[in-house]
From Swiss-Prot:
It is found in: Archaeal flagellum. Residues 1-8 form a propeptide. GO terms for molecular function: structural molecule activity. Flagellin is the subunit protein which polymerizes to form the filaments of archaeal flagella. Keywords: Archaeal flagellum. GO terms for cellular component: archaeal-type flagellum. One of its GO terms (biological process) is archaeal or bacterial-type flagellum-dependent cell motility. The keyword Transport does not apply. Belongs to the archaeal flagellin family. It comes from Thermococcus kodakarensis (strain ATCC BAA-918 / JCM 12380 / KOD1) (Pyrococcus kodakaraensis (strain KOD1)). This is Flagellin B3.
Length: 258
């Protein structure tokens, strides 16, 4: 009988150990399930962010430059204006143009420009004429430094300087590109207007300097045989690339550079 009692005691002890092991396993399983759930959600979030970062971005489709013609001396001056055509990458989310930065360098100067959407008196209109909608006869039309459009929105090139760029809307089916809140969406095309020099030609064909004279990005402008590099950098996603060399001589005012 004593032997049987010992066997019963051993059986109860084994049962207690077994129950304890089951409880420990249950706790461990719960921890693993919670951890795996957290990691799954974290990986999904990271995946979405990575996909957005890779898919999002802005691309530079072309760059056109303008060199004013000095009729009195029969010579083209350095390039004074750049029209940088941009659109969003395929699959990109909306790009807030207020947060886009344009970086330009000629090897000696590096400038960083932003869109000036200031509205000091809060009347719902821009303080400067740096936004335009529609297709003009000439993007670089320049009687008084102004590109005119139908309506009351137009670009005044003289109000751009070495720290700001303007926006000319070429295509915007959903109306997302607005003066104070310009957002570049799928299918949109816009021109980033950059004044890189200080001269223009008036309606009489005479060479004029902007007055008062706010500096262009590269002073007098971009001279022949100059290598320009840079980027159009959105808040999120891949930047658009700027990389071109100007012709060795200028033989016309409007020229495609990239």
């Amino acid at each position: 009988m004593r032997f049987l009692k010992k066997r019963g005691a051993v059986g109860i002890g084994t049962l207690i150990v077994f129950i304890a092991m089951v409880l420990v396993a249950a706790v461990a399983a719960a921890v693993l399930i919670n951890t795996s759930g957290y990691l799954q959600q974290k990986s999904q979030s990271t995946g979405r962010q990575t996909t957005e970062e890779v898919a999002s971005g802005i691309k530079v489709t072309s760059i056109v430059g303008y060199a004013p013609y000095d009729d009195s001396n029969k010579v083209y001056k350095p390039i004074s204006k750049l029209a940088i055509y941009v659109s969003p990458n395929a699959g990109s989310a909306g790009i807030d143009m207020k947060k886009v930065r344009v970086i330009l360098s000629d090897g000696s100067i590096e400038a960083v420009l932003k869109y000036d959407n200031s509205d000091a008196d809060s009347d719902g209109t821009l303080d400067k004429d740096v936004f335009a909608v529609g297709m003009p006869d000439n993007v670089f039309e320049d009687d008084t430094g102004t590109t005119a459009y139908d309506g009351d929105q137009y670009i005044t090139w003289s109000e751009l300087n070495d720290k700001t760029f303007g926006i000319i809307v070429v295509q915007d089916s959903d109306g997302s590109l607005k003066p104070l809140t310009p957002t570049l969406n799928k299918g949109d095309i816009a021109i980033i207007a950059v004044r890189v020099g200080n001269y223009y030609v008036d309606s009489n064909g005479n060479l004029q300097a902007y007055s008062p004279t706010p500096d262009g990005v590269f002073g007098e402008g971009i001279k022949p045989n100059t290598h320009i590099t840079g980027q159009v950098v959105p808040e999120h996603g891949a930047p658009g690339v700027i990389d071109f060399t100007t012709p060795s001589t200028y033989t016309q005012s409007v020229m495609e550079l990239q």
